A protein has these predicted regions:
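Conserved acidic/glycine
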Residues: 86, 99-103, 110-114, 298, ...
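Short coil/turn segments at secondary-structure boundaries
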Residues: 88-93, 137-138, 283-284
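Anionic group-transfer/hydrolysis microenvironments
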Residues: 26-28, 50-52, 139, 193, ...
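Structural signal for hydrophobic packing residues in well-ordered secondary-structure cores
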Residues: 20, 26, 74-85, 97, ...
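Thiamine diphosphate
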Residues: 7, 13-18, 57-59, 65-67, ...
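Active-site diphosphate/adenylate-binding microenvironment
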Residues: 98-176, 182
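Glycine-rich, acidic loop regions that bind phosphate or pyrophosphate groups
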Residues: 1-93
Length: 308
C-alpha cells in the first residue's frame, strides 16, 4: 500500500488511525515514521518483531513483543494464521490511493510549466529503466524516487530511509552495481548530497563501475528549504547552494556527462544515458522551489497528513 511516515503515501498514513492490528517487523519506530508517537496506531494492537531488545517498547508500546530473528519468529506466527477476507479494508485503501494519485502524483509527473520537475524525471527514468535497481541519496529526490519509481521486481531499492545520511547514495550505488552486475543501477541524488561524497566519482573511474547518476540540481538543500518555506515564513538560512561545475568534475573523472533543463530534452537524454556502456552523469536542472507532498508536519499524528 506504500510507505508510511512524514513523506510517505497518503493511504497508509490516513488508515494508521483505523487499523485494529499493526505488525511491525524489525523497525525502530523513529519519529519520521510515527509522527506523534502517542497517537501512532492508537486503535491498534501492536505486534513488534525485533531482534534487539533495546528497541522493544522504547518509543511505542507493543502489546505483543516478539524477540528474536525474524527468519525464525515470523513463520511461527504466519503458520497459525487463517486467511480472511479483507476486501472492504483494501477498498478503503484504494480510495485513499486514488486521492493521492489524482491530487499529487499525476500533476507531479505531468510535463507542464517552464521547468523540469523531479516527479516527471523519476517517471521518465522508470519508463526506460524498468529492471533497474534504484538507489537514492537523501532529500526531496529521495521522496520522489522512492514513491514514484515503477518497481517490477523485488530487491530493487536501496535508500537509507529516515536516517538522513546525505552522501549515502553514490557509494551505495557503486556497491549495488558490483553486487548485481547484470542489472542497471540508477542513482537519484541532489546537488547537496552529491558533494558530500563527490570523491567517489574517482572510485567509479578507477574501478570502471557503470552506474547511471541522475543529478537533480535545484540549487538548494531542497528538503530543508521546504521546511523553511512552510514553517519559517520563507526565511531561507544556509540552504541556497553555489555549486561547482559538475561537467568539469565529471569530465575530470572520465565520466560521460550531459546537462538538460527542458521537457523536450528529457526522454532523449535518458536514452543516451541508458545506451552508454560506462558510467554516466545526467545533470537535470529542475524547478528550484518545488515542494514534495504529502507531508506530515513534525510532531503531528501521521493521519494529519497534508496534501499541499
Amino acid at each position: 500500500v506504500g510507505m508510511l511516515g512524514m513523506h510517505g503515501n497518503y493511504a497508509p498514513n490516513i488508515k494508521n488511525r483505523d487499523c485494529d492490528l499493526l505488525v511491525a517487523i524489525g523497525m525502530r519506530f523513529d519519529d519520521r515514521v510515527t509522527g506523534d508517537p502517542s497517537n501512532f496506531g492508537i486503535n491498534a494492537k501492536i505486534v513488534h518483531l525485533e531482534i534487539d531488545p533495546a528497541e522493544i517498547n522504547k518509543l511505542v508500546y507493543a502489546d505483543v513483543p516478539v524477540l528474536g530473528d525474524v527468519k525464525r519468529t515470523l513463520p511461527m506466527i504466519t503458520e497459525k494464521i487463517s486467511k480472511c477476507d479483507h476486501s472492504e479494508w483494501i477498498d478503503e485503501f484504494r480510495v485513499c490511493y486514488n486521492i493521492e494519485r489524482e491530487e499529487i502524483i499525476e500533476p507531479a509527473i505531468e510535463r507542464r510549466g517552464p521547468h523540469l520537475r523531479m516527479g516527471e524525471v523519476v517517471d521518465a527514468v522508470a519508463r526506460q529503466f524498468d529492471d533497474a535497481i534504484l538507489v537514492t541519496d537523501v532529500g526531496q529526490q529521495q521522496m520522489f524516487a522512492s514513491r514514484y519509481f515503477r518497481f517490477k521486481h523485488t530487491r530493487s531499492i536501496i535508500t537509507s530511509g529516515g536516517l538522513g545520511t546525505m552522501g549515502f547514495g553514490l557509494p551505495a550505488a557503486i556497491g549495488a552495481k558490483i553486487g548485481a552486475p547484470d542489472r542497471d543501477v540508477c542513482l537519484f541524488v541532489g546537488d547537496g548530497g552529491l558533494q558530500m561524497t563527490l570523491q567517489e566519482l574517482g572510485t567509479i573511474f578507477q574501478s570502471s563501475v557503470p552506474v547511471k547518476i541522475i543529478l537533480m540540481n535545484n540549487g538548494f538543500l531542497g528538503m530543508v528549504r521546504q521546511w523553511q518555506e512552510l514553517f519559517y515564513n520563507h526565511r531561507y538560512s544556509f540552504t541556497e547552494l553555489t555549486n561547482p561545475d559538475f561537467e568539469l568534475i565529471a569530465r575530470g573523472n572520465h565520466i560521460p556527462y550531459r546537462c538538460i533543463e527542458r521537457h523536450d530534452e528529457l526522454d532523449e537524454a535518458i536514452a543516451q544515458m541508458k545506451s552508454c556502456p560506462t558510467a554516466f552523469l545526467l545533470e537535470v536542472r529542475v524547478e528550484r522551489e518545488e515542494n514534495v507532498f504529502p507531508m506530515v508536519p513534525a510532531g503531528m499524528p501521521v493521519n494529519d497528513i497534508r496534501l499541499e
